[in-house]
Amino acid sequence: MRTREKSYEDYGLTKEEIHYIKEFCFNSNTEQQKEIIKVALSELSPYIASKCLESLIHNKSYDDLCKEEYLYIGKDDFYGYRRKGMAAVKRWMIWNHIWEM
């Protein structure tokens, strides 16, 4: 299955977990939290990782990012990789004993 076609459920993420990950990323105020997000997203290509990082930390949608600059990735692909990145953030949170769900 292509990354763009995978859903949150395919990554084993529930609605509560999605909300928890988004809140963790948006409220990441320590260097440790930001480093966990960066390392987790490093599983993606550097360009996609940087855009997913900006999206998660600043709570920006694909359209918000497109208003600032042209994105070299389609909307479906962007959100597919963002979901994959969120699953990676969850894994890194578990490995670093930060996951509290």
Where are these regions (language model features)?
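Short acidic alpha-helix initiation/capping motifs at coil-to-helix transition points
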Residues: 29-33, 56-58, 78
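Helix-turn-helix DNA-binding module
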Residues: 58-76
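DNA major-groove recognition helices of helix-turn-helix
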Residues: 78-96
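Short amphipathic alpha helix immediately N-terminal
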Residues: 43-62
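Short, well-structured alpha-helical interface segments that form or flank functional binding sites
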Residues: 32, 47, 73, 77-80, ...
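N-terminal interaction/assembly modules
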Residues: 1-43, 63, 70, 91-101
